[in-house]
Amino acid sequence: MGIQAAEISAILKDQIKNFGQEAEVAEIGRVLSVGDGIARVYGLDNVQAGEMVEFPGGIMGMALNLESDNVGVVIFGSDRDIKEGDTVKRTNSIVDVPAGPELLGRVVDGLGNPLDGKGPIEAKERKVADVKAPGIIPRKSVHEPMATGLKSVDAMIPVGRGQRELIIGDRQTGKTAIALDTILNQKSYNDAAGDDDSKKLYCVYVAVGQKRSTVAQLVKKLEESGAMEYSIVVAATASDPAPMQFLAPYAATAMAEYFRDSGKHALIIYDDLSKQAVAYRQMSLLLRRPPGREAYPGDVFYLHSRLLERSAKLNEDFGAGSLTALPIIETQGGDVSAFIPTNVISITDGQIFLETELFYQGIRPAVNTGLSVSRVGSSAQTDAMSSVAGPVKLSLAQYREMAAFAQFGSDLDAATQQLLARGARLTELMKQPQYSPLTNSEIVCIIFAGTNGYLDKVDVKEVGRYEAELLTFLRSKKADFLQWITDEDPKFKKGEPVEKMKAVLDEFAADFA
């Protein structure tokens, strides 16, 4: 049977029309089973660990378990639209997220997709979410202060740029409040820095397993205070799948590392890592990995250590940037010896321990000064702060110990009564309302007044009023003196400015009644 001329021309036209169109080649697999946010996929023989794969409908997943006959994939989204037999495509890229200044002021999910309805993010760079931490050579010891604006923290448990300081405590003890105040406190420093990026501190807040309403309130507070302009919020809320809650801290760290590696300074707050560990446990058990203590998988320590080791202070050869971490851990009934709390305590450079009992006594922030410690922060304190804050921690620790014994006996000697009286006033002095951070110079003046006997004749109930009026006096009449404390910081080592500070406090004491 011959081919007619009309057919030949039709075939030629068809060939010419399709000329140069290359077929798209993609390595695909098939879904064997799906459920609980986990898909078993057959056929992706060359897939990499941690690689992104794509399901029908644009749903993404990450290959975690590479087994001999199938691949265990965790799904970043709803698994309801995925069914057995669906095709799964490789993307040939490890999970990465957008990074850069374009993210500032935005609220994103664990993959960097916007959640705030302000349009797409036009980031010029992308960074792999889970990268290796800097080695030993690029690092430098922590030596610059990272002010939180909280008297009890900056004086007794100082945090330096590049440090990892754990905030640990039961639920509803004010852990997030400390972290939020720290972000708000950076506004005055960032405004004072102007265009000098090397002095600014960019903040990244990661909400893991929080209620959406809580995250919305936090974002609203940051926007009202003008703090969103230097902040990024990464949210993997309670309603998000476990893989999203597991990934969010890594993705946020990659965003913060952009600033660290550009010679700038960043702060990252993980709120909180207990919920990330729970999400990771859920994923691991569903992937049939063997459980260990408290049913957590064997590598749950590595989960947190590889995350927190990425926070570091880099030396001048590598840009002198820093990434400071404030991980938050929620304890159950004050049990700091549980598995996850002990893991994170051993990884970090100190902890701020918050106590329910102190919180209910009205001592807020409810910092237990005896159990809290900063292992490297003292070398980052300003000379002014370290010279006046030295006696405070000792005085408070002695007061707490003595107060317990004083309940039993009434005939106390004069020295003990003096210690108890001053301790009660220092405890009162450490109280601070939320959203009211103080500058370094203001804290120095307040602590100096407390440790040098200026409060000894003030009634305990009047300490709050004394502090409020002292701050008003300093801000309105002695603004140049506050600036002088900052400018003449090195002189505090030699004890030179003591007389000048006493003169200012004597002047205020004459007016205070």
UniProtKB/Swiss-Prot annotation:
Chain positions of site Required for activity: 372
Cystine connections: none
Entries under SUPFAM superfamilies matching the protein: C-terminal domain of alpha and beta subunits of F1 ATP synthase, N-terminal domain of alpha and beta subunits of F1 ATP synthase, P-loop containing nucleoside triphosphate hydrolases
Enzyme Commission identifier(s): 7.1.2.2
CC annotations in GO: plasma membrane; proton-transporting ATP synthase complex
Reaction catalysed by this enzyme: ATP + H2O + 4 H(+)(in) = ADP + phosphate + 5 H(+)(out)
UniProt subunit comment: F-type ATPases have 2 components, CF(1) - the catalytic core - and CF(0) - the membrane proton channel. CF(1) has five subunits: alpha(3), beta(3), gamma(1), delta(1), epsilon(1). CF(0) has three main subunits: a(1), b(2) and c(9-12). The alpha and beta chains form an alternating ring which encloses part of the gamma chain. CF(1) is attached to CF(0) by a central stalk formed by the gamma and epsilon chains, while a peripheral stalk is formed by the delta and b chains.
Record protein name field: ATP synthase subunit alpha
